[in-house]
């Protein structure tokens, strides 16, 4: 799932959603097998989540700066809209991941010990 989220964040707003870099899709197919996601690139779950959070923050900051550029008139409307749509997609992904983590935590706390 994490590799799919990374592939989504790597998509450009100007390319079709089905177009993914072949390098990323090849590595994601190997990483989707159970038990190999962390072993494929030697990254821990915490570091992957940290990288995703920092990517999300940079995407949101980029959209904010692009909106200011649009207000100043230095960016086209299309650039501003593309940047805002990418930021919205990033935010929706972060919210979905947060909801899944909270749900998993609640399930663990309901377990009897």
From Swiss-Prot:
Keywords: Bacterial flagellum. Signal peptide: none annotated. Belongs to the FliE family. The lineage of its organism: Bacteria, Pseudomonadati, Pseudomonadota, Alphaproteobacteria, Hyphomicrobiales. It comes from the Bacteria. The keyword Coiled coil does not apply. GO terms for biological process: bacterial-type flagellum-dependent cell motility. One of its GO terms (cellular component) is bacterial-type flagellum basal body. One of its GO terms (molecular function) is cytoskeletal motor activity. This is Flagellar hook-basal body complex protein FliE. Its main location: other. It comes from Rhizobium leguminosarum bv. trifolii (strain WSM2304). InterPro entries: FliE. It is found in: Bacterial flagellum basal body. Pfam families: FliE (PF02049).
């Amino acid at each position: 799932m994490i590799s799919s989220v990374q592939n989504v964040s790597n998509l450009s707003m100007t390319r079709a959603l089905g177009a993914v870099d072949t390098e990323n899709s090849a590595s994601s197919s190997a990483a989707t097998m159970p038990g190999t996601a962390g072993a494929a690139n030697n990254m821990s779950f915490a570091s992957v989540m940290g990288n995703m959070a920092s990517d999300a923050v940079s995407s949101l900051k980029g959209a904010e700066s692009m909106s200011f550029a649009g207000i100043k008139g230095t960016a086209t409307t299309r650039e501003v809209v593309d940047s805002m749509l990418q930021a919205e997609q990033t935010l929706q992904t972060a919210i979905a991941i947060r909801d899944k983590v909270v749900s998993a935590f609640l399930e663990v706390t309901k377990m009897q010990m």
